[in-house]
Amino acid sequence: MTDGVNINDSRHFTFNTNSQPVFNEQLTSILKSNSVIKTLLSYFDKGYVHLTFSLEDMAENVTAYTTWKSFDSYHMVFNSQYATEQGWDIPLDGIDNIGYDRSKIKTTDEALVVTLTHEAIHANHFAIFNDAFLQADKGIYETYNILQEKGYSQEFIDIFIDKKTNEWTSNEQRDINMHEYMKKYDHDVIDAALEEYRNDFK
C-alpha cells in the first residue's frame, strides 16, 4: 500500500488541495499506493523537478490539466467543480479525449485514478522532453538527437518537433499530438494503474 510516491517530501510535491479534504485524502491515498503512477512521476519523486497539485474552477468539459511554470516547477490542476465535500464527483462516463473505455470505471474513486494517471502521463512526457531540451541547451536538432539516443520513438519526438518544418510544435498542436499518442499507446498504462488501485483498496 506504500509503493507509490513519497508525498511527504515537500521538496518534491506541494498540495494546494486542502480546501476539499475528502478529495485531498483520495488524491494522496492513490499517490502513496500506486506504483504505476510512481513510475510516471519518477522525475518528481526523485526530486529532479517539483510538482504542485491544486484546484481551479474550469469549464465543465475539462477535468484537469498539467502544465509547467518553469522547467523545475510543474502544476497538475483539477477542476474544482468536480472536487466536492464528498470527494471527486464526476459522471463515470464523463470527459475523455484519448478514446479510453470509461465503461471500465465503476466508482468515482476509480474515475480519479483514471484522471490522475492521464495527467501523470502528461507530466511524464513533458518532463522527458524538457530534460532533453535543457541538456541540448534548447537546440532543436540536439533535443531530437538526445531523445533518439535515449530510445524514444519517432512518434514520441513528433509530439514536440514538427517533422515537416523541423520547428517546435505549437502548444495547441502539441496537445493534439500528445493525446493521439496516448490514444495509441497509453490505455494499458491506465488499465494497470486502475487494476493496482482495485487490488490495493478492495
Model feature map: region roles:
Residues 1-110, 125-202:
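Predominantly extracellular/secreted Zn2+-dependent metalloproteases
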Residues 108-121:
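Short alpha-helix carrying the canonical HExxH Zn2+-binding catalytic motif
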